Amino acid sequence: ALLWALNAFFQGWGAPVCARLLTTWYSRNERGGWWAIWNTAHNVGGALIPMVVGAAALHYGWRTGMMIAGGLAILAGLFLCWRLRDRPQTVGLPEVGDWRHDEMEIAQQQEGAGLTRKEILTKYVLLNPYIWLLSLCYVLVYVVRAAINDWGNLYMSETLGVDLVTANSAVTMFELGGFIGALVAGWGSDKLFNGNRGPMNLIFAAGILLSVGSLWLMPFASYVMQAACFFTTGFFVFGPQMLIGMAAAECSHKEAAGAATGFVGLFAYLGASLSGWPLARVIDVWHWSGFFAVIAIAAGISALLLLPFLNAQAPRALNEA
């Protein structure tokens, strides 16, 4: 148990650091697409690693499989340490906002000049109401995401009477939809809303509510239609799952992008934990109607929490709330 906890602890270091690099090297009006591509890494890795490690474990034992996974992670980390630089100025380049003539990026670069790291963390993360709104929204989005991932195959088995393999294949469509949805959300927030994540977040949150409602209120006896519903739900869930983290980085101080992303990420995993035992109790008492009611309510409230972000977002500090 201790080793698993340490494994998760060190894995958690990756995302905030990547968020900091993405906010440093890409400007506001292009960041969504690149952030979306980075966000698909866990989908691609989640698909490839079981095949690579599974084959190694089958032929050489489970210890070898785990060592291969760890070895690949170490090699990738060493390569990144060798090739990555913390900011453009390190290699003699101007700040990315100046290079791209991005007004909102320039505003974020100039925000809070001269503050200490403690003042930045306090003002732009811990006491920033917009970060707290995004954190609460992340809890609800992850309730929906983890609920479909954890309970979707059981729902398919009980409602359609299909075997577990067939049920899991439908849940796979949820991940596939999420892969595409994250790319569309990132690209759309750049091209359609000029780097404002609020409108796209709200559109996708409304889509979560509609797609969850289609699974709940219009149950299809056809496996194909159920799989299509899982696909659309994944498409809309993974948009906010990606955009909320990026919005947190952009609503904070540029020097606190990693801290802001890590802070909202903490609440995301709180939401994932709520889809375990608490949701199991809901299913025991109110069955699948209760299950879908809970995640539909979560989707609806998440949409309401995103309403303050409809306007274009410069850095948000406490005194702007």
What name fits each language-model region?
Residues L3-N43:
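Cytoplasmic helix-loop-helix junction between adjacent transmembrane helices
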Residues W38, H42-V91:
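Helix-loop-helix hairpin linking two adjacent transmembrane segments in secondary transporters
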Residues V91-L133:
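Juxtamembrane intracellular "pre-TM" segments in multi-pass secondary transporters
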Residues N128-L183, Q241, S275-G276:
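Extracytoplasmic gate region of multi-pass secondary transporters
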Residues L183-G195, I283-D284:
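Helix-to-loop junctions at the C-terminal end of transmembrane segments
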Residues K191-A205:
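Cytoplasmic membrane-interface "Motif A"-like loop-to-helix N-cap segments
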Residues A206-F220:
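C-terminal ends and interior cores of transmembrane alpha-helices
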Residues K254-V285:
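A late C-terminal transmembrane helix in Major Facilitator Superfamily
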